[in-house]
């Protein structure tokens, strides 16, 4: 059996821009993509903590060290600058690997700088 599991996530990223006229995707600082093991054009889920919106799109790299998180295309209708979001990447694992895999969780501050890198999540853990 194959299982779709969280592979990694960028936790509490701050949206820096929204470009309705771009053809699609979410632009993410390439340093953050590398930290979260997200490849260019990889499918990601975006969860907006401000309004509850959820969407799927693909990641494109932004300038390294810039902190850019830009919702492009239709996503700009759901995610606005200043919103706090979670960007989640998933992987497909066989049953055995799924039971032991520990996802990489990248915690960010308000300027999208990495504050912590953790493996896995603990039930009841709160990070604000």
Curated annotation (Swiss-Prot):
Location of the active site: 25, 58
UniProt pathway: Cofactor biosynthesis; (R)-pantothenate biosynthesis; beta-alanine from L-aspartate: step 1/1
Record InterPro entries: Asp_de-COase-like_dom_sf, Asp_decarbox
UniProt GO MF annotations: aspartate 1-decarboxylase activity
CC per GO annotation: cytosol
EC number(s) on file: 4.1.1.11
Disulphide bridges, residue numbers: none
Pfam families listed in its UniProt record: Asp_decarbox (PF02261)
GO process annotations (BP): alanine biosynthetic process; pantothenate biosynthetic process
Residues given in the record as substrate binding sites: 57, 73-75
Note on cofactor: Binds 1 pyruvoyl group covalently per subunit.
Post-translational modifications: Is synthesized initially as an inactive proenzyme, which is activated by self-cleavage at a specific serine bond to produce a beta-subunit with a hydroxyl group at its C-terminus and an alpha-subunit with a pyruvoyl group at its N-terminus.
Reactions performed catalytically: L-aspartate + H(+) = beta-alanine + CO2
Modified residues (Pyruvic acid (Ser)): 25
UniProt keywords, alphabetically: Autocatalytic cleavage, Cytoplasm, Decarboxylase, Lyase, Pantothenate biosynthesis, Pyruvate, Schiff base, Zymogen
Subunit-structure text: Heterooctamer of four alpha and four beta subunits.
The protein's role, per its UniProt record: Catalyzes the pyruvoyl-dependent decarboxylation of aspartate to produce beta-alanine.
Record family assignment: Belongs to the PanD family.
Protein's recorded name: Aspartate 1-decarboxylase
Gene this chain is encoded by: panD
């Amino acid at each position: 059996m194959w299982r779709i599991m969280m592979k990694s996530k960028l936790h509490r990223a701050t949206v820096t821009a929204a470009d309705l006229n771009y053809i699609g995707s979410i632009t993410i600082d390439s340093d953050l993509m590398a930290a979260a093991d997200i490849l260019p054009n990889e499918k990601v889920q975006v969860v907006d903590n401000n309004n509850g919106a959820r969407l799927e799109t693909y990641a494109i790299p932004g300038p390294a060290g810039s902190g850019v998180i830009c919702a492009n295309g239709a996503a700009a209708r759901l995610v606005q600058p200043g919103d706090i979001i979670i960007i989640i990447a998933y992987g497909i694992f066989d049953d055995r690997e799924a039971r032991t895999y520990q996802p990489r969780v990248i915690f960010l501050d308000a300027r999208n700088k990495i504050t912590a890198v953790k493996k896995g999540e603990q039930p009841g853990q709160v990070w604000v």
